């Protein structure tokens, strides 16, 4: 069973994320924010609004997950401990690429696998947690030929050991951001 954050943890008396506590930001109900990827060519972004309590934001790419050789990471991770639910967000400055180092499916899958291996962070992705992937880009989402298997692999990782099996389009979301 996944750990739940209690009131003491919210007040800072206990640390739910252990040594990773400083890598997570607690967002208040009603908070509006633009999540921005400064590394992308176009500085891609997505606006979010927090609609619940106990929502935490982290940046796996460069902050939460160390820059090990070959380790790919998604840009943002949102965790709501009340549901529990984890959302992985990959912001793209262009359409989805079939290149292995740049496709969002691999980046999100590697992030999930890293979390599964970590003693403290595995609670973000265990079987009790509903997981969603958001792939954000400014253009129309055209999925390159030959990458369908990556999409299916990501979906399988999202529903792995889950109580309720969901369809692929319920867990992988494509977002087009317009200015």
Regions found by a protein language model. Name each.
Residues 94-115:
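Mg2+/Mn2+-dependent nuclease catalytic core
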Residues 76-78, 85-94:
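Conserved catalytic cores of phosphodiester-cleaving nucleases, focusing on short active-site segments
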């Amino acid at each position: 069973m996944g750990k739940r954050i209690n009131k003491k943890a919210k007040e800072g008396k206990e640390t739910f994320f252990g040594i990773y506590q400083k890598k997570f930001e607690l967002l208040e109900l009603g908070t509006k924010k633009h999540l921005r990827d400064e590394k992308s060519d176009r500085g891609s972004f997505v606006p979010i609004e927090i609609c619940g309590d106990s929502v935490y934001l982290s940046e796996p790419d460069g902050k939460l997950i160390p820059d090990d050789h070959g380790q790919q990471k998604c840009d943002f991770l949102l965790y709501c401990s009340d549901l529990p639910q984890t959302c992985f967000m990959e912001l793209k400055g262009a359409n989805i690429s079939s290149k292995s180092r740049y496709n969002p499916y691999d980046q999100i899958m590697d992030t999930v696998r890293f979390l599964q291996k970590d003693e403290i962070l595995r609670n973000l992705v265990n079987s009790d947690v509903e997981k969603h992937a958001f792939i954000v880009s400014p253009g129309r989402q055209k999925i390159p030929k030959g990458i369908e298997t990556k999409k299916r692999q990501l979906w399988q990782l999202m529903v792995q050991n889950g109580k309720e099996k969901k369809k692929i389009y319920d867990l992988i979301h494509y977002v087009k951001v317009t200015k």
